[in-house]
Amino acid sequence: MTSVAGDTAIRLADAVVALGGFPALAGASMSVERGELVALRGANGTGKSTLLRLCAGLVPLARGGATVLGVDLADDRVAVRQLVGLLGHRNGLNAELTCRENVAFTAQLVGASPNDVDDALQRLGIDARVAVTRAGALSAGQRRRTALASLIVRRAQLWLLDEPHAGLDTAARNELDVILRDATRSGATVLYTTHEVDRAGLATPRTVTLSGGCVTSDVSSKFGVAQ
């Protein structure tokens, strides 16, 4: 399924998600335009991961409104799952397969070609040596790049990344920032979670803060304006 035309990738209006009777999101409202790079900041337990899972169509909306890439989540969560890519802490890789085999497996599922796999690896700066290395033997940064290459071959329009900088050294974190900016220049929208104040403010044009399941601030570091 293709997405409906429009400039807004994510629109939440007083969105409530209840997990086990507990309001993991308690009336969150925000919007993300297509092509934006946005950091979602907050302490553990504030609803960051739940918001990503909501936008990925993995958890139901209890109340409020939520539209992702032109699709109303109340109507068709399955359609949304075909349009977005959610990357969690474990990267979703098979440790016994090589880097390239992991990406090729995703390509096979979505009907992408071997050339698409090669192009994705090249975009992520994955060289021939890394490509034939088992995922279990890769560094944290290399595993993250492999997982992101899978999002590219899926042609995911919206990248939802849960703590993508976690476990990376400074050099790998800075390289990841460049990759995410390049992804938006290529047409993707990127929303990632972090609990690091400095990383959100310095590396990303816009930072949305969650507390208690609600959006408490929305700041553009590029223009220095709080919304």
Enumerate the language-model features and the residues they cover.
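ABC ATPase C-loop
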Residues: 151-152
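Catalytic Walker B motif of ABC-type/P-loop ATPase nucleotide-binding domains
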Residues: 159-163
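Conserved ABC ATPase "signature" region
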Residues: 104, 114-130
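The feature captures the beta-strand-to-loop junction immediately N-terminal to the Walker
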Residues: 41-43
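Conserved ABC transporter NBD signature motif
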Residues: 64-75, 80
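Helix-to-loop junction immediately C-terminal to a conserved catalytic motif
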Residues: 56
